[in-house]
Each structure stands twice: as C-alpha cells, then as structure tokens.
C-alpha cells in the first residue's frame, strides 16, 4: 500500500515536471547579440503564437544595407535553412519577423545572410536549442 502511494506521488511529480518543462520551452527565448561584419546590433526573440514558431528581431536591430539580406537558421545538427528576405520589394518595408517552417527543429543560431553575394553578414545564438 505504501509503495503504491509512493509510486503515485512520484508519477505526479514527474508529470508536473514534464508539464513545466514543456511550458518553459514554449515561452519566449532571446538570443545573444548579433555579431558580424554587417549585422551587429540587436537580438532575435523566438515565440510560439497560435501554434506557429516565430522569430522577431529587436527594435535596435538594423537590417544591413546589402542587395539581398535574408533570414537563415541553423539547427543543432548543423543544417542550414534559408527563409525569407528581410527586405520587401515594394517600397522600403522590412520583414522584421518570420514564421519558421514546421519541419525546422532545434534552432541554435539565426543568421543574416546576403543571398546575392552568398556571404554571412552576422549571426546570433540561443543558449539552448529552440524546438
């Protein structure tokens, strides 16, 4: 009887711990500061909104003045995923957030990449992989 009670308490503690870890994993995560030759201001924050994984640069981030600055992410296995361009062709609008595709998991870095010159402009890392 005592063993069953201890197992029940242990199962409850394990479930609560798993729930709190899951909740913390879905909370906002902010990267280190961008570092690189052209992208060296601001940070990027990861959030989950309406079931979508979103990356958003901070207000102090300056989009590099290059022909084709582009969002890229690197996962924990070293795979690189090229996402959207920072600049919208119509006018001087900037795309300061991007939805991460559902097949991308374990993001450890966000990069600003010039797709035209094929050169890395800067990157920011997370303290642990973002799922």
Language model features with spans:
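Transition segment at domain starts
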Residues: 23-50, 129-131
């Amino acid at each position: 009887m005592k063993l069953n009670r201890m197992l029940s308490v242990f199962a409850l503690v394990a479930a609560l711990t798993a729930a709190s870890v899951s909740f913390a994993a879905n909370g906002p995560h902010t990267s280190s500061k961008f570092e690189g030759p052209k992208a060296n201001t601001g940070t990027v924050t990861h959030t989950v909104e309406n079931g979508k994984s979103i990356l958003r640069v901070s207000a102090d981030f300056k989009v590099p003045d290059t022909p084709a600055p582009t969002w890229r992410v690197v996962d924990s296995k070293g795979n690189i995923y090229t996402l959207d361009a920072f600049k919208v062709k119509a006018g001087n609008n900037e795309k300061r957030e991007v939805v991460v595709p559902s097949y991308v998991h374990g993001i450890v870095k966000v990069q600003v990449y010039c797709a035209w010159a094929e050169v890395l402009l800067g990157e920011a890392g997370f303290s642990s992989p973002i799922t």
